[in-house]
Amino acid sequence: MSSDAVQTRLLDAAEELFYGRGIQSVGMDDIRSASGLSLKRLYQLYPAKERLVEAYLERRDGRWRDRLATHVDTAGPDPLARLLAVFDWLELWFGEPDFRGCAWINSFGELGGVSATVARHAREHKDAFREYLRGLVRDAGRPDALAEHLYLLAEGAMVTAGIFASTAPARQALGAARALLA
């Protein structure tokens, strides 16, 4: 098996377990079992669990941002439609069968107080999302302050959807976003 295939298999297993069960409840032996790799190989690739957590958050961040941007691009050139498409995408994401909330909020809640690495990744992800929204708001010719309001709507929807396993918070946030844009 190629090095890339081993890495993919390992990160797939780690992501499924970390996101599904929480980081602290998953041991390296759980990841070994799920990935089918030896514990020796696992520790060769990631000598510490925190490094595997970091790789998981980095990979998930890239995929999350790509999926959001791809969906927003399907809204076409209209700046307001693109901005509102963020909330449409949140509803799609919240409706995924394995949705368990925001991986960065969950990770920060578990480890943000004891892991500077996890705290940094959570902040970087949230800052990137805020900046993405700010860009969409500017493209729509609206004031930067609106981006902060929309950001808080989206973040609140993420937390609520994760807790209640519902897509309704995305629709409610979309309604509030429309009111702010009116």
Predicted features, each with a name:
Residues 1-5:
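N-terminal intrinsically disordered/low-complexity leader segments
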Residues 96-116:
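Amphipathic alpha-helical segments used for helix-helix packing
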Residues 55, 69-98, 150:
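Hydrophobic alpha-helical connector segments
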Residues 117-127, 138-181:
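Hydrophobic/aromatic-rich alpha-helical bundle segments in the mid-to-C-terminal region
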Residues 62-65, 69, 81-84, 114-139, ...:
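Amphipathic alpha-helical packing segments from all-alpha helical-bundle domains
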Residues 53-60, 67:
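Alpha-helical DNA-contacting segments of helix-turn-helix folds
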Residues 9, 13, 17-51, 55:
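Helix-turn-helix
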